[in-house]
Amino acid sequence: MLDKLNQPKGSTIGVLKDGRTIQEAFDSLGYLGVAVLSPANYGAKGDGKADDTIPLRQCVQDACALGGRVVGTVGAEYKISGTIAGTVGDGKYVELDFTGSKFVPTTDDAVMTITGVATSPVAEVTVEVVSVNLGNGSTNTIAMKVTAPGGHSFTKKGEIGKAWSPVLCLNNDLSTQYAGEPFVVGLVESSTVFYTTSVFTELYMGTSLKVIRVPTTQVVVKGLDVESEWTTGWKASTLTLSGLLRPFVYKPKCKNINGPFVNLTGCYGATVFLPEGDNLRNAPSEGAYGYFVNDSASFGSTIYGINCTNARHAYTTSSPRSEPTDDKWWLKGRTLFSEITNGLGTGCHNAFDTHSPSYGIKFTNCRAVGDFRGVDTGGAGFQIRGDRSSLVDCTAINSKIGAAFTAVNISGNSELYISGFTYEGPAGHLALSLSGKAGQINRVTISDSRWKTLEQYATAITNVEVSASNVEAVVDSATTASAAWRIGEGATLRTRGGAARFSAGSGHSVISLAASGAKVDVGDLEVTGSSFMQYLLATLSQYAGDVYIEADLDGALPGNPVGGGGTDLKAAVVYTAGNKFRRPLAYRALTIGNANGNTLGLNYSGHDVITWEITATVAGANVNGITPGAFIGQQLNIGSSPASTQQLIIKNGTNIAMGHAVTLEAGRGVTLYWNGANWRSGSV
């Protein structure tokens, strides 16, 4: 159609309302070397009554085919009954600017799809790891040598390609998700050989590996505003960009739509800037998924300034479905290295989400408010199911779960990094839920974070290794026996610094062990509100694994620092009143007023040196049992108080093997040491 409009210079064919000829308008509306097209010139009414599908489709298709800029009419309301689809080849610049206009779908069809079409051929290749000089220096680089016996289409360093194979992608959650990943050319050696420093995984090392050069199309979509009505059975996506290099979506907006809004499928370096959405219908039983931004098998997307209310996910990753042997390269692979910044999701089912196949997704300064348990979702502000994701300076308020990590579908080891995370929620809500997979190494690293909850437990951990530093947990629960950390099967908790604070209820603990075999190593922890506490560590099993706790309390505990632990439990080091020279577990003043045998406990003390001062008030007063030491070399000083009126006898017995009994007069003492099996005498 554009060719028909473009007449010879000076042509007077056709006159517009403003008196200009079509040719004059065509010549004057160039933009960066491309034509500027108006849907009105194609017959679009934009009056909210007429069906504008056909003229809009033709206008967009012309712009995509030849390279051009479409500018909608400010104030127009375009009713559409079918998809506006365009395909864009190499080297084209396409801009679709609908700022100030609105689209109203009248059928269950996608509003707009733009697909990049590679003009280069698909190449079947083999790969091998080699050392090659890719720069001007003398140091070689480990790279992938890619050989295409039938030839490839790459011509220079820096070009971007896509590789794929008929093997299922890593950590797939559907059996139709196949491996694929982009790469950057490092060196073109010949028409059949090139090199890349991108690391192809083992999924690409077998047969049937293919590559293609990603089209160099530039696509910009501005001001797309779509408003619909919730309709049972509707599920179509709104905007889908597929197979494009660095597409840019500027200020898209939606309201009351029935499926995903912005879909990035197999794109490289996409940007979505300031998207805004309200009320995305979520009905999984109908195939309707309220994804606001769906980042699908794309690489390095940047999503800035999400503002979304009432959706399944404000942001999510996914891996598209495809056939193992087709050449739809944009439908291959998983989402890699995307970053979501300054996002806000309110009243969503799970505001920010990643599916299992994703890798390296980063959320920075994102906020989730009021996420709830919706249809087929779990109510987490941040739901992380991929590997190597990170939450940086993020906040969840009143979400059912602040942040949830699960490795159920992860086929190998996985990690999550959390820094500067803040959570606040009512009773029944949980700050963190971390669930790993038995037999794998699932790690979560947390730093400089704070959460406050009225729930019985602030965190729940199962089959995950947690390393935390400077984490403050505030538990305001009135429920008896609450805890800042709940440690389950196969879990390890290591913390340094930070605090646990209690301000209501009674019988609380810093840590509650919910299963055998858990490991706890807590150092330099500040604990306030000890008047509301019963233990530092409450065990729900008789053997709790390896435990070491060092805490600074603001007052004494009513009993032992560890409750319900078996004799194999390790140790606790407790300080009180902010004064680390006062060690209640390291010193005990006792009285023995009977001639029976007495077994005394260390209260699980982990101090290097422990001192007991015992007052003996009856003849034959003796100690014939001591609970095990925390570690080899731990010392126990036992002294007979100057106030003793009788001798104090230390006998061989339970965990005591001195060779002979020791009798102590008033004011005398003995030093014992733990050798890993028994207490032995060191001096008298």
Curated annotation (Swiss-Prot):
One biological process term in Gene Ontology: symbiont entry into host cell via disruption of host cell envelope
Q: How does it assemble?
A: Homotrimer. Interacts (via N-terminus) with depolymerase 1 (via N-terminus); this interaction probably gives rise to a branched tailspike.
Provide the coiled-coil residue spans: none
Q: What does this protein do?
A: Functions as a receptor binding protein (RBP) and probably mediates the attachment to the host capsular exopolysaccharides. Displays a depolymerase activity that specifically degrades the K5-type polysaccharides of Klebsiella pneumoniae capsule, which allows the phage to reach the host cell membrane and bind the entry receptor.
Broad class of where this protein is predominantly found: virion
Q: What is this protein called?
A: Depolymerase 2, capsule K5-specific
- How is this protein annotated for GO cellular component? virus tail
Q: Which family does it belong to?
A: In the N-terminal section; belongs to the Przondovirus depolymerase 2 family.
- What's in the keyword line of the UniProt record? Degradation of host capsule during virus entry, Degradation of host cell envelope components during virus entry, Host-virus interaction, Viral attachment to host adhesion receptor, Viral attachment to host cell, Viral tail protein, Virion, Virus entry into host cell
Annotated compartments: Virion
Which organism does this record belong to?
Answer: Klebsiella phage K5-4 (Bacteriophage K5-4)
